[in-house]
Swiss-Prot record:
The keyword S-adenosyl-L-methionine does not apply. This is GFP-like fluorescent chromoprotein dsFP483. The lineage of its organism: Eukaryota, Metazoa, Cnidaria, Anthozoa, Hexacorallia. Fluorescent proteins have become a useful and ubiquitous tool for making chimeric proteins, where they function as a fluorescent protein tag. Typically they tolerate N- and C-terminal fusion to a broad variety of proteins. They have been expressed in most known cell types and are used as a noninvasive fluorescent marker in living cells and organisms. They enable a wide range of applications where they have functioned as a cell lineage tracer, reporter of gene expression, or as a measure of protein-protein interactions. There is a cross-link at residues 66-68 (2-iminomethyl-5-imidazolinone (Gln-Gly)).
Length: 232
């Protein structure tokens, strides 16, 4: 095991802070949790500390906490575990979420490590969400399971998801998510083109979503038709 990967233990703690605005409304969220990086599971408990109750559906925040740290993804031996190897220095990501009704979320996350605890410093901006849409009306009910495709480009790792929220009364609310992952450590070996399958659920919440518990399972894989490249 490399020195970098050895700093990631079988169980890791999570401490996070999110500062954000939604259609101009300011809010802050703090959270703590733990997870098993090699198994691909983690759970966080979150609390709105400023700006609550939030004037929008909680679910658009879920990916910022859970999809937020790719160190909590199970990788098979034939997929290079690039972001675990970025520690102890850590990594950053920038994300855009384009919703079908014109709503837009722009998010950044700086992930660092102290001892056996990951710290997430998250900045969130939500814009252009229509007042009659499912987010402002709080009609979203959860995320479908998703598959993110990941590929290296110009020294960073790019992730794309065509995602969907379920809504009250049936149907879906579509969203395209793009994330750029950047290791702080130079000259890390990049993985090839691969996928990460994710299931994100809310385990518990109060009526106003002032306190929420989320759980995630995430597994990396190749496409079923994948064929390793042969050395020339």
């Amino acid at each position: 095991m490399s020195c970098s990967k050895s700093v990631i233990k079988e169980e890791m703690l999570i401490d996070l802070h999110l500062e954000g605005t939604f259609n101009g409304h300011y809010f802050e969220i703090k959270g703590k949790g733990k997870g098993q990086p090699n198994e691909g599971t983690n759970t966080v408990t979150l609390e709105v500390t400023k700006g609550g109750p939030l004037p929008f559906g909680w679910h658009i925040l879920c990916p910022q906490f859970q999809y937020g740290n790719k160190a909590f993804v199970h990788h098979p031996d034939n997929i290079h575990d690039y972001l675990k190897l970025s520690f102890p220095e850590g990594y950053t990501w920038e994300r855009s979420m384009h919703f079908e009704d014109g709503g837009l979320c722009c998010i950044t996350n700086d992930i660092s490590l102290t001892g056996n605890c990951f710290y997430y410093d998250i900045k969130f901006t939500g814009l252009n969400f229509p007042p009659n849409g499912p987010v402002v009306q709080k009609k979203t009910t959860g995320w479908e399971p998703s598959t993110e495709r990941l590929y290296p480009r110009d020294g960073v790792l790019i992730g794309d998801i065509h995602h969907a929220l379920t809504v009250e009364g049936g149907g879906h609310y579509a969203c395209d998510i793009k994330t750029v992952y950047r290791a702080k450590k130079a000259a890390l070996k990049m993985p090839g083109y691969h996928y990460v399958d994710t299931k994100l659920v809310i385990w518990n919440n109060d009526k106003e979503f002032m306190k929420v518990e989320e759980h995630e399972i995430a597994v990396a894989r190749h496409h079923p038709f994948y064929e390793p490249k042969k050395d020339k």
